[in-house]
Amino acid sequence: MASGAPDGKWKVVKKGKKSGEKGGGRKALSESNVTPGGTAPIKMANTVYEMGFEQILKKQNKEQVPPNNIPAEQPQKKQQQQQNPGRKKPQSGDTGSRQRKFHTLEEGLKALDLAELQRELEKSQNMFPESPSIWVKDLAGYLNYKLQTVKNDVLIQQSHDYPYCLVNKELKGIVRSLLAKAPHVLDVMVDHCIFSMFQELDKPTGESLHGYRICLQAVLLDKPKTVTNNLPKYLELLRSQVNRPMKCLAVMWAVGQAGFTDLSEGLKVWLGLMFPVLGVKTLTPYAILYLDRLLLAHSNLTKGFGMIGPKDFFPLLDFAFMPNNSLTSSQQENLRNLYPRLKVLAFGATPESTLHTYFPSFLSRVTPSCPAEMRKELINSLTDCLNKDPLSFSVWRQLYTKHLSQSSFLLQHLVETWDSNSKAMRKSVRETVHSFKVTNGEFSGKGSSLKDLEACDAACQALLHKMKGSGFPWRRLIVIAFVFLFGFVFYDVRTHNSFQASTSHKVLQQSGLLSVSQQAWSKVSNYSLQGQSWLERNVPQYYSQAVEVLGPVLEQVWAKTQEGAAYACEKGSVLITYTKDNLPRLIEWLHSHTPDSVCQFIEYLRELLLHLHRTYLLPAVTYLEAAVQNAWQQYVASCNGKVTWDCVRGQVSNISHSSWTYLQNTTMTVTNWALSIISHH
């Protein structure tokens, strides 16, 4: 059996030789397999040692022991075969000892003998009870040896959980059971799988890597911290293999599996391992693809709040929007599509207390040479900072003199969007603009940035003008008019000692308003008196009848309601207790008895819905919005640019007339067609 050592190399455990045996030291395994000429091939025993690790042991023993002459080993080989007839090996040239390759991984998984796997794992545990690292290495080697396919699958073209999604529950249970027995050597297993993948990638025609990948996913989907606690080690490994893209992609894929069950761990992996190599031509596509899959797998971004700070966010912003960087245009476009979700992650759950820390970096990037798309994004982000975090205004006032050109762009944007700003923001902008006006007066005629200062001053003037003329004060005008009218009437009545002798009474009487108001008041008074008298006569009678008829019923209803509420509370508490006790068992039972086909169907359905959402629903909504906007513009144009009630009435009349005419014509056409058919018969 292959045994693990503290240095991570393979060693061979062999039985001790008898004193009478003669040999020139320890022989390599490939040398001991050489049989005398004419000997028939020996059937290979079905053990993990002989099947899963024979090739690895041959290579390791050849490296550890220099080969001796073959003729000197043949007597010893015969003696070993006589002593251990059950441990015979086939000739090195025997093609029957090779594991056959399957056309697809699904075929290999269906053909896998789980009972044999269980026996080999038990044998490994019995032989090395104190070395769990050997158990997990045996598991990885056995699975990879048994799951060989004719063609290696391209992982970028597969789902993020491939190939583990193809594994049935029985095999998953065996793997998880063994991993649970060796929790302290999971990092050893991860490193073993990665370096075994490296060895296969070094070969011109290396074997498939499905077994190693399945073991990596089994570990990291359950214990992601196995790799996220050692990210610097894997980053160093990645940089050491930067000229070997396939090895780098193997490391990125392996470590990236830690992120699909926990968004925070996935962001750790991306920021610590993949972001540093963003821009490397051969690695950038997978880094962006992994980020896309990670954010797609976690629709709830709240678990990732706090993982991205200004130190990581602004380099991402530059990669997404700055031209002439190391990304291609399509890669930049993909990163820009992910940028809104990265922005949400960066701002976190409480943007009102964190956005002021992003404000300086946003402001410093709004330069005259900044691309238009990036400038638009920066200006919108600065506006969000000012609108959500009031501390951003104080930060802006401190940076104003050092960033005059950038401030002019932001001030001009505030002028253009003044009407859409909130009242709280308008108040803060007013105070800030007054502060800027004072600063502009102090720096006027000084320094070399006179042009930028003039642009800022002009924008401040425009903002002040907007503040003064933001709209006609109808409310104030109505209040003032009411107060003035009340004061005039009060003064008029006081001057003439009575309302009948006042000028106000004469004006109201001449205009007819007084008589109309008197008639209205008399009618209101009359109806009020009638209503009051009716209520006085009928309310006591109706109330007594209602109490007599509905009183017993309401009492019974109230009593039944109390009893029902008490019964519901009692049964509800019992049901809640029962659910708490049995829900985990139910979940476990469903998990163990649900067919894999159901899980695959749900996954396929999810992918289908996502495809429909992206391919059909979003374009349909966009088309509908454009159609509605176009229809509205045509309607406004038909009204000569002014939507009035007369225009609406005319449009409705035209539509009704057109519909009625069309209905009449259709009816006549159908009638004529029916009559012609009848007449022919």
From Swiss-Prot:
Keywords: Apoptosis, Endoplasmic reticulum, Glycoprotein, Membrane, Transmembrane, Transmembrane helix. Pfam families: TMEM214. It is a multi-pass membrane protein. GO terms for biological process: apoptotic process. It is found in: Endoplasmic reticulum membrane. The chain crosses the membrane at residues 471-491, 608-628. InterPro entries: ARM-type_fold (IPR016024), TMEM214 (IPR019308). GO terms for cellular component: cytoplasmic microtubule; endoplasmic reticulum; endoplasmic reticulum membrane; Golgi apparatus. Residues 1-41, 58-99 are annotated as: Disordered. Glycans are attached at N300, N324. Critical mediator, in cooperation with CASP4, of endoplasmic reticulum-stress induced apoptosis. Required or the activation of CASP4 following endoplasmic reticulum stress. Belongs to the TMEM214 family. Constitutively interacts with CASP4; required for the localization of procaspase 4 to the ER. This is Transmembrane protein 214-A. It comes from Xenopus laevis (African clawed frog). The lineage of its organism: Eukaryota, Metazoa, Chordata, Craniata, Vertebrata.
